[in-house]
């Protein structure tokens, strides 16, 4: 069920590919940053608990 893109097929498919790669990178960066912030928050909460 692939639509016919004619002479623009390579350009359109390359654009889709680039979009998917950038989207995957953005999602990965978001997940990595979220994990870092979670670890930092947990460490800060431990310091607050230990300080009384």
Swiss-Prot record:
Gene Ontology annotations for the cellular component aspect, listed alphabetically: plasma membrane
Where in the cell is the protein located?
A: Cell inner membrane
What InterPro entries does the record tag this protein with?
A: Haem_export_protD_CcmD (IPR007078)
User: Which Pfam families would you find in this protein's record?
Assistant: CcmD
Stretches that traverse the bilayer: 12-32
Keywords, alphabetical: Cell inner membrane, Cell membrane, Cytochrome c-type biogenesis, Membrane, Transmembrane, Transmembrane helix, Transport
Looking at the keywords, is Protein biosynthesis present? no
Q: How does it sit in the membrane?
A: Single-pass membrane protein
Gene Ontology biological process? cytochrome complex assembly; heme transport
* Family from the record: Belongs to the CcmD/CycX/HelD family.
NCBIfam families given in the database record: cytochro_ccmD (TIGR03141)
What does the function comment of this entry state?
Required for the export of heme to the periplasm for the biogenesis of c-type cytochromes.
Q: Write the protein's name.
A: Heme exporter protein D
Recorded source organism is Rhodobacter capsulatus (strain ATCC BAA-309 / NBRC 16581 / SB1003)
